[in-house]
Amino acid sequence: MGYVVKEEDSQTGEVTRRGPFVTEKEARMVLANAVEQAYDFNPQLAMANVRQEVEDAVRDGRKDCFDAKGNLVCRYTIEQE
């Protein structure tokens, strides 16, 4: 039993899994890194306070990322296996 971080690309439907991780804390750290990289490297995403977005993701265990028009671009979630 472990935790995985799933990234879903809403445009292609592709799902990428990272893990499994032994603890939820590990998964949350990977989630934080993934969200930070998404905002750093994806020009589609709306300008945001990246630090706040990462903090929200770690707190909630999930993050939806939107473009400037409000369209969902990607979704990150932590799931227990």
Predicted regions located by residue number:
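Conserved aromatic
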Residues: 21-22
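Short aromatic-glycine-(Arg/Gly/Cys) micro-motifs in beta-strand/loop hairpins
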Residues: 1-17, 26, 33, 45, ...
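Short, mixed-charge low-complexity intrinsically disordered segments
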Residues: 33-81
